[in-house]
Amino acid sequence: MGPRARPALFFLILLRTVAAQGRPPRSHSLRYLFMGASERDHGLPLFEALGYVDDELFVAYNHESRRAESRAQWVLGEAHSQLWLQLSQSLKGWDHMFIVDFWTIMDNHNHSKESHTLQVILGCEVQEDNSTRGFWKYGYDGQDHLEFCPETLDWRAAESRALTTKLEWEVNKIRAKQNRAYLERDCPEQLQWLLELGRGVLDQQVPPLVKVTHHVASAVTTLRCQALNFYPQNITMRWLKDRKPVDVKDAESKDVLPSGDGTYQSWVALAVPPGEEQRYTCQVEHPGLDQPLTATWEPSLSNTLVTGVISGIAVCVIIFLIGILFRILRKRQASRGAMGDYVLAECE
């Protein structure tokens, strides 16, 4: 895959990180995704930003328009508010910072401006106990590159070629302190404001409909646990064997996907030994549930009836065949008895 094909793919990967499988139930998050391309062709922007609250898109910004555009009904009336203007100014500042960082990284790699991309994800999460966690990560040409550590005010290099930029940025302590102030103070405050605006929309909770289905293919028995029609999309699904968690490596999971009606769906599957299906339980946690929900595979009544009918027919066929065989044997025995009393006449 060439450099031009990577940006869209990596951006999709970033979007998947927004999915709440990585965010605990009953927490809230504010995330910004930035992407830029060194060449303005093939539909790739120099800088584009998308903002998400609890995984719901609420704002978009690009280098050409240089303004924040609302992407959710619950923020439409805030275009002229002081906080929205501050948000717009922040995005303009990030626009400039992003481009400067982009050129710095390319220079440190001795790269020309042809066919390179930069991606950033930054934001914060607020847990149910009001504790917070901030994050600020860079990706270059589709690979993890640098991550800011607010506790130590330094940068962690995800690859060796990022070391030069890491050392250069760590000299700038003013920027590091500004980054930490945003992650630990400004971001949680902005998130609280947005949650207030979205009250009644963002705080709605629709519990999932959970069912377990049974599949047999190529001599492999699989149980699939489906969670349907839930909101918000942060959900935790796991398999239990004899009430103990199964290693996640043994299970196949599906990303949380929109259902098309404002709700979400997901599933997790597990291959099990035939005949041991009842030992496995699917456990689901979701903000709409007061406690974890469990579900097991229940053989359907129709399957039971079909099995019973087939078994009954098989028994009847066997009895019928035994009866026919019995009659044939009796006839043979009768024929042998008649032949025993018959004597051939002598020739005269």
Curated annotation (Swiss-Prot):
SUPFAM superfamilies: Immunoglobulin (SSF48726), MHC antigen-recognition domain (SSF54452). Residues 1-22 form the signal peptide. The chain crosses the membrane at residues 307-330. It is a single-pass type I membrane protein. It is found in: Cell membrane. Belongs to the MHC class I family. Keywords: Cell membrane, Disulfide bond, Glycoprotein, Ion transport, Iron, Iron transport, Membrane, Signal, Transmembrane, Transmembrane helix, Transport. Glycans are attached at residues 110, 130, 234. The keyword Electron transport does not apply. Residues 115-205 are annotated as: Alpha-2. The keyword rRNA-binding does not apply. Residues 207-296 form the Ig-like C1-type domain. Residues 23-114 are annotated as: Alpha-1. One of its GO terms (molecular function) is transferrin receptor binding. This is Hereditary hemochromatosis protein homolog. The lineage of its organism: Eukaryota, Metazoa, Chordata, Craniata, Vertebrata. Disulfide bonds join 124-187, 225-282. It holds the Pfam family C1-set. It comes from Dicerorhinus sumatrensis (Sumatran rhinoceros). Binds TFR through the extracellular domain in a pH-dependent manner.
